[in-house]
UniProtKB/Swiss-Prot annotation:
Keywords: Cytoplasm, Methyltransferase, rRNA processing, S-adenosyl-L-methionine, Transferase. This is Ribosomal RNA small subunit methyltransferase G. The gene is rsmG. Signal peptide: none annotated. GO terms for molecular function: rRNA (guanine-N7-)-methyltransferase activity. Belongs to the methyltransferase superfamily. RNA methyltransferase RsmG family. It comes from Enterococcus faecalis (strain ATCC 700802 / V583).
Amino acid sequence: MLPEEFRQLLAAKGIELTDQQMTQFDQYFHLLVEWNEKMNLTAITEEKEVYLKHFYDSVSLAFFEDFASDKAICDVGAGAGFPSIPLKIVFPSLNVTIVDSLNKRITFLTELVNQLGLANVSLYHDRAETFGQKAEFRGAFDYVTARAVARLNVLSELCLPLVKKEGYFLALKASKSEEEINEAKPAIATLGGQFQKEVGFTLPITADERHIVVIQKKKETPKKYPRKPGLPNKQPIK
């Protein structure tokens, strides 16, 4: 997917990008490739692959959820900034918070945010387990996203404490897994969430599968969650 194809395919979905936004995506691509030579940010570095599997993939969340107003979104374990930074470029009024446990990624993201001139983006070097216990962040976000390989029961413990009541946790997955969702339902309920739906679609050109698991926060998460670093992964809620 070349940049102009990216623009046209988003326009077909009702998302019109300005020349300035296209320039920001171009800067993003070049910074990603440049910094990737110093640190391992992504295995995907070809321009057409980055535009498809990082940029388009991230913005595809907006095909199913409304990011057009000044909502607050927290991206847990954002890595090189996906999906939150592409969403921020497309929807400048979003308030974005990113938490990542690797300081080198935060260093890259700080440079990226500055170079792209993005306002209202906060970056935190922290473990999700400790970040989620901080009063100013608990129940503070309209949307919390995770584009990670961890299982849904683990991700739910890291993400749901941050979601405000009636807000949403959006888990981006590469494949459909009813078994994984069913396994996670007790944890989701314990954490105050409710499974809403799973949306499946395919990326253009490659037809790679993508799935978004949508979980709504219905009540406050008990104070004991998230547990200490490492525990959610070692002993998932059953």
